[in-house]
Amino acid sequence: YAGLDIGGTVARMKIEYADGRAGEFYGAGGTMNTDGYEKCNAKYRSFILPILEEAQIKAEDCVKICVAASGIDSPRQEEECRRSFLEMGFRPESILVYNDCEVFLHVSTGPAIVLVCGTGSIAYARGESGAITRCGGWGHVLSDEGSGHNMGMKVIREAANHIDGRTRCPILYELFEAQSGLKTLDEINTFVNDMLMEKTQIASFAPLAEKAYELGDETGLKILRECRDELFALVKDVYYKADLDR
């Protein structure tokens, strides 16, 4: 048996072998709705196939494999994800594919809300009738409020505004400059545009908000509070969308 949790930045795989042993492995993640099939397929294969080879097991021998992947937002993307695992040798009847947030709703029965926030953000809910609804998770351009990418962009904006003389956040700026090596607005602008679809690179600056606050920069706290409020709004929206207020 195998289970995969594939986020935008990190992928995790757990395997239970026939003799009862278990193994856990980590690799690079990917998001189907923004990275696309070709890129995600390459990441899936480079992560999973070496694990199978090292363990001397065949994909076709897997009884069940549950894939909870970021960016599985439509039947087409679900089918593309399934195709990737079929091409690796897993049997059609052994493959289960879910959005990485939706899968948590299957842990219990009855009304529930799940919020997942990593590189991106998404909320799912199951109402009294059993119907499943979602809010958010439509990529870093349309949504992903409060996420690692969103927080990372806020850090970059505040650092840019500090250079531009529009705000003062010297500690946050120094942390950003030390990590990025970027010193001018032109350099920052070029970096952001070059990394527009590389969410992991932008999200890597998110921890600087907390570090800056711990060192006495109130701008760091402002960013943390903004992301907190955005995540709360996401939960509130899916709560009402699922009619859980009735």
Feature names for model-found ranges:
Residues 69:
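Short glycine-centered, acidic/aromatic-flanked micro-motifs in structured strand/loop junctions
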